[in-house]
Amino acid sequence: MGEAVEVMFGNGFPEIHKATSPTQTLHSNQQDCHWYEETIDDDLKWSFALNSVLHQGTSEYQDIALLDTKRFGKVLVIDGKMQSAERDEFIYHECLIHPALLFHPNPKTVFIMGGGEGSAAREILKHTTIEKVVMCDIDQEVVDFCRRFLTVNSDAFCNKKLELVIKDAKAELEKREEKFDIIVGDLADPVEGGPCYQLYTKSFYQNILKPKLSPNGIFVTQAGPAGIFTHKEVFTSIYNTMKQVFKYVKAYTAHVPSFADTWGWVMASDHEFDVEVDEMDRRIEERVNGELMYLNAPSFVSAATLNKTISLALEKETEVYSEENARFIHGHGVAYRHI
């Protein structure tokens, strides 16, 4: 068996190596493995056996890697944090995209902040009501290598309804005159020195994002880990921040195996957006092309039924996310090395 060995970049992003010794080989003909280790906290790491490293480097904005893992297939890693895995990304992306679109009476236009791998756009474009999707990602390099290697999303990138913009989502959303039925935050986790944390702040939600929502418009964002031990990292503060800006806010969670944790999303609007279970399933049947692999009405009801610990934490949270008072996931972005 191989041993996971890290050689760390200056900002803590691990380079993957292979180490061997006679005691690590169970059989004389067994191949040693490369392993990737993700640091979850100072005293906790997850390890993933690799087939190969498809891409690894540093763009202008973030450290990026695309790994071919034995268990989860191709995996996108940004600033040392797994963002998406081929085998189970459908859980994350179906939960991120479909509830908001199904709760809206007739969604036609969507703006995606981030989403460079193309999976969010793929799910949105399954909806027959959609006329236009703007996907705005800051990092051309991420988009380019995802288009090359994540072929499952090739149809989305070629769809005439998709407008791809390489730019800071905050600046792009601010300059646009149109309004959108749905705005999606498919952003990397907020890490210190990363490019995304400003897009989780109250000032951004209130002054830039909310004015770009059409009547009945819904905003939904990924909100980080939401497990028993991890929900206070950013999940509860993102939820509370959105409560300061929107009249109706709903949090929901699901377990994502490749993240080794429960994940959280938060949806918000100034217009009530709940629908009955039967109506939600009816809309899936009428509006969505193809079969969803994870989400149906009962599974969403389950996702939005939070356990006592998480419910109380959301209720008691007082922190409001701001540039001066930001919470971060463990780790550092590219800009941190220049601080």
Swiss-Prot record:
Keywords: Polyamine biosynthesis, Transferase. InterPro entries: PABS, SAM-dependent_MTases_sf, Spermi_synthase, Spermidine_synt_N, Spermidine_synt_N_sf. Disruption phenotype: Severe reduction in the length of stem internodes. Increased thickness of veins in leaves and inflorescence stems. Altered morphology of xylem vessel elements. It catalyses: S-adenosyl 3-(methylsulfanyl)propylamine + spermidine = thermospermine + S-methyl-5'-thioadenosine + H(+). The keyword Transferase applies. It holds the Pfam family Spermine_synt_N. The active site is at D186. GO terms for molecular function: spermine synthase activity; thermospermine synthase activity. Induction: Up-regulated by auxin (IAA), but not by abscisic acid (ABA), brassinolid (BR), gibberelic acid (GA3)or benzyl aminopurine (BA). Down-regulated by salt stress and thermospermine. Residues 33-270 form the PABS domain. It comes from the Eukaryota. S-adenosyl 3-(methylsulfanyl)propylamine binds at Q62, E117, D137, D168, A169. Highly expressed in stem internodes and roots. Lower levels in young seedlings before flowering and rosette leaves. Expressed in the vascular tissues. Restricted to procambial and/or provascular cells during primary root development and early leaves development. The keyword Isomerase does not apply. GO terms for cellular component: cytoplasm. GO terms for biological process: auxin polar transport; phloem or xylem histogenesis; polyamine biosynthetic process; xylem vessel member cell differentiation. Changing E123K: In acl5-1; loss of function. PANTHER family: THERMOSPERMINE SYNTHASE ACAULIS5. Belongs to the spermidine/spermine synthase family. HAMAP family: Spermidine_synth (MF_00198). Required for correct xylem specification through regulation of the lifetime of the xylem elements. Prevents premature death of the xylem vessel elements. This is Thermospermine synthase ACAULIS5. The lineage of its organism: Eukaryota, Viridiplantae, Streptophyta, Embryophyta, Tracheophyta. The gene is ACL5.
